[in-house]
């Protein structure tokens, strides 16, 4: 069966190297690997002249000249200059091999947090037993407890209100469909006294704080005892609640399931996404005192102010490059480790961050909501529209340091600078070839001299005669 380049036929590794037998998930990765066997070694070390098939191999080779300790991955043999980078890289192997299966449907997930979210959304616990008084549903074991606590014996089915009746709280705007719900809610507005036996039953013996429910008191007591029953399998950190553990695990996996529909930016928590969306709605209460720019979140203002002060508190341990935000450093580290955990289900292309994947998916869907008011051209993200509008305004802010040419945005400058790099590489290759040919034809003991004036004139005459 023919498979389009770059698209995996299955989730296995169907593309095998005919030389060493190593398998790959995508054909493009196999082609890059085969360069090492085929002698296509375009990257040359300036110190010793050794050539490598990939830029990453050349970078590892140069560490040997610096006398730097190398950390080798036992799974694939890739080398790293720092142990922290090796740890990040090993996570890619763990996620591939130790997937988490769902016991109910068999679907597999790369990490525990994704499995937990799947079970909550797709397999919620069955609650077939409905309360006849308030219409709430419970598992069989929880229904008797609910009836005894929320509906005392004096409550009967005959006196139950119609479902459309609402019970309003006199202390706040909230309303409830049952008197029991209002009763439970009203406890948060009452400061219990020491003479109240109900308050005494749910009072903390350590600090004296009272609670309306025994389950709330139990969770509170865990703070005093230091008990944290929900442990992170990655780092061992404990948490009081499973929901907090799920949010913490996203710091290990980099998972950001909440995406902004306007700009593609992703967040690990829904509350952070809601705060971010204020910026698209015009709400920017946090103002920079230096330039007057507004932000929807205070943290975004703090990160922005570092652009004025030059502060970059998050340096890369591999190349020393500094970043204003920890998340930017995390994404940058993946360029060293080669980790691309997010892949497109349609074409197999992989990405270092989920926001780039979301933007890429818009290209498949043809969704380009950002339209230029000048020419009508549409773009998938607002940042590309902003760059495009500079061409209408005639702004050229990106300058090439080699030739002084200006460009309207950084991508055009990067493409232009590649031409300088290609020219330098071609000149270096030509110099190397000339040196090799000279040594082979003349020999080390002879001295190469230029042609005499008479030879030059004869050469010119012969060349002219050949072309006529």
UniProtKB/Swiss-Prot annotation:
Q: Which gene is this protein's source?
A: Znf672
Task: Report the protein's function.
Answer: May be involved in transcriptional regulation.
Is Nucleotidyltransferase there in the keyword field? Answer: no
What are the subcellular locations of this protein?
Nucleus
One Pfam family in the UniProt entry: zf-C2H2_4
Q: Name one GO cellular component term.
A: nucleus
What S-S linkages are listed for this chain? none
Biological processes, Gene Ontology terms: regulation of transcription by RNA polymerase II
Give the source's domain of life in one word: Eukaryota
Q: Which UniProt keywords apply?
A: DNA-binding, Metal-binding, Nucleus, Repeat, Transcription, Transcription regulation, Zinc, Zinc-finger
Can you name one GO molecular function term for this protein? DNA binding
Identify this protein by name: Zinc finger protein 672
How far does the signal peptide extend, from start to end residue? none
Family, according to the entry, reads as follows: Belongs to the krueppel C2H2-type zinc-finger protein family.
Residue ranges annotated as zinc fingers (C2H2-type) are: 15-37, 43-65, 71-93, 100-123, 129-151, 167-189, 202-224, 230-252, 258-280, 286-308, 314-336, 342-364, 370-392, 398-420
Q: Which organism is it from?
A: Rattus norvegicus
């Amino acid at each position: 069966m023919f498979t389009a380049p770059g698209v995996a036929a299955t989730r296995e590794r169907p593309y095998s190297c005919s030389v060493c037998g190593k398998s790959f998930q995508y054909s493009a990765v196999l082609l890059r690997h085969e360069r090492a066997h085929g002698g296509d070694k375009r990257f040359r070390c300036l110190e010793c002249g050794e050539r490598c098939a990939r830029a990453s191999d050349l970078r590892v080779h140069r560490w040997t000249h610096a006398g730097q300790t190398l950390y080798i991955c036992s799974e694939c043999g890739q080398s790293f200059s720092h142990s922290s980078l090796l740890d990040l890289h090993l996570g890619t192997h763990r996620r591939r091999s130790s997937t988490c299966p769902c016991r109910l449907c068999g679907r597999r997930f790369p990490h525990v947090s994704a499995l937990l979210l799947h079970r909550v959304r797709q397999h919620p616990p069955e609650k077939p037993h409905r309360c006849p008084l308030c219409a709430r549903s419970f598992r069989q074991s929880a229904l008797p407890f609910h009836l005894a606590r929320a509906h005392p014996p004096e409550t009967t089915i005959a006196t139950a209100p119609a479902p459309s009746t609402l019970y309003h709280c006199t202390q706040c705007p909230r309303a409830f469909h049952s008197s029991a719900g209002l009763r439970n809610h009203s406890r948060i507005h009452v400061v219990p006294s020491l003479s109240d036996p109900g308050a005494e039953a749910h009072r903390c013996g350590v600090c004296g704080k009272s609670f309306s429910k025994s389950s709330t008191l139990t969770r509170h007591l865990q703070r005093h005892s230091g008990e944290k029953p929900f442990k992170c399998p990655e780092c061992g950190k404990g948490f009081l609640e499973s929901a907090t553990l799920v949010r913490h695990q996203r710091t290990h996996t980099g998972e950001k399931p909440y995406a902004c529909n306007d700009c593609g930016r992703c967040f690990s928590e829904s509350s952070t996404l809601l705060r971010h969306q204020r910026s698209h709605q015009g709400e920017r209460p946090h103002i920079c005192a230096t330039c007057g720019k507004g932000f929807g979140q205070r943290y975004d203002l703090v990160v922005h102010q570092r652009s004025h002060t030059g502060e970059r508190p998050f340096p890369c341990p591999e190349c020393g490059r500094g970043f204003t935000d920890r998340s930017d450093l995390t994404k940058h580290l993946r360029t060293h480790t080669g980790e691309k955990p997010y892949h497109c289900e349609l074409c197999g292309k992989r990405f270092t961050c989920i926001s780039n994947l979301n933007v890429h998916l818009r290209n498949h869907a043809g969704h380009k909501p950002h339209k230029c008011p000048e020419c009508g051209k549409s773009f998938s993200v607002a940042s590309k529209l902003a760059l495009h509008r500079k061409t209408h305004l005639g702004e050229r802010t990106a300058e090439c340091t080699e030739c002084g040419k200006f460009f309207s945005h950084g991508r055009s400058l990067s493409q232009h600078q590649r031409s300088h790099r290609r020219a330098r590489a071609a000149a270096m290759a030509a110099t190397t070839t000339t040196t090799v040919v000279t040594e082979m034809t003349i020999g080390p003991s002879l001295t190469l001299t230029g042609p005499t004036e008479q030879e030059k004139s004869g050469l010119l005459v012969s060349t002219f005669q050949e072309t006529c």
